[in-house]
Structure formats: structure tokens, C-alpha cells
Amino acid sequence: MAIEGVLNEGFVTTTADKLINWTRTGSLWPMTFGLACCAVEMMHAGAARYDLDRFGVVFRPSPRQSDVMIVAGTLCNKMAPALRKVYDQMAEPRWVISMGSCANGGGYYHYSYSVVRGCDRIVPVDIYVPGCPPTAEALIYGVIQLQNKIKRTNTIARKG
């Protein structure tokens, strides 16, 4: 059955999970947690050339309005409690993108006494974007991968 037949009859069938996940992928509101030079590339991704708005990504200033956190840069031991506090203030469901080598595993500062060796020790990470610093294209690819992950989740029907 072609799409013309569906439109002529006036109805489309789908599951509630697919509908909910489709709406979630089209309205990702990230909380920016820019800690170092990776934040500049995150700003590039939000600017006119790459325009994350076309993916439904709108940066929000408050964690209570966000459902995605992008951790970009070196996470220090003093900043780790603040990262966890902001994560806890975000509404469910929430996702985390770790952007850059420093956020993924400490990066260049891996052996420093004051650096957390990966933000996944503080918050659960869904998508890792590698690079030092990763390009805006890499962040967009990470957002697309997060959208694909959200589409695969079961929100209502739990498979046993």
C-alpha cells in the first residue's frame, strides 16, 4: 500500500511507542555544559552554517527545560558535583552526550590529579563524540545517533 492510499483513506496506523519516540527525536533541548575548547565547536554547530535547529535541537538555559546534556570539555574534580546536580535537575527522560576526548576519558589531561577521567564516572553517558576538539559535523552525527537510539527505546511496551 502506497502513501497515496493512506492519505486518501485518512488514517495511519502505528504504535504508541513509535509515536512518542518520533516526537521526542524532533524536539531535543540540550543543556550546554561547555567546559573547554569543545564548547566552541558546540557553538559552531548551533550557528547558521550547521544549524542544529533543523534537527529540532534548541539550546536551553535551564536544566529544568532540557532533556539532553552535552558535556563538552575537561571535567575537573571541583566541577563534578555541579555536573551531577545539573543532571539531577533535568526532567525524565534525559540523555547525555559526551563531546571530546577530555569529556570521554580525560584527554590530554588524563594523568592530572584534578581531572575526572571521563564524565561517565559522574553521569550515565548515552553517546560519545570523539575528537580533540571534535568538529561540528561530529556533534551533529552524535545528535543523529542519539535520535536513532531514542527511536529504538521502548517507553510504553516493555519487552520481557
Swiss-Prot record:
Record keywords, A-Z: 4Fe-4S, Cell inner membrane, Cell membrane, Iron, Iron-sulfur, Membrane, Metal-binding, NAD, Quinone, Translocase, Transport, Ubiquinone
Superkingdom of this protein's organism: Bacteria
Location in the cell: Cell inner membrane
Pfam families: Oxidored_q6 (PF01058)
Membrane topology: Peripheral membrane protein
InterPro entries linked: NADH_UbQ_OxRdtase-like_20kDa (IPR006137), NADH_UQ_OxRdtase_20Kd_su (IPR006138)
Cellular component terms per the entry's GO annotation: plasma membrane; respiratory chain complex I
Reaction equations catalysed: a quinone + NADH + 5 H(+)(in) = a quinol + NAD(+) + 4 H(+)(out)
Cofactor note: Binds 1 [4Fe-4S] cluster.
Subunit structure comment from the entry: NDH-1 is composed of 14 different subunits. Subunits NuoB, C, D, E, F, and G constitute the peripheral sector of the complex.
Similarity section: Belongs to the complex I 20 kDa subunit family.
Protein's recorded name: NADH-quinone oxidoreductase subunit B
Naturally occurring in which organism (per UniProt): Cupriavidus pinatubonensis (strain JMP 134 / LMG 1197) (Cupriavidus necator (strain JMP 134))
Lineage: Bacteria, Pseudomonadati, Pseudomonadota, Betaproteobacteria, Burkholderiales
Gene assigned in the entry: nuoB
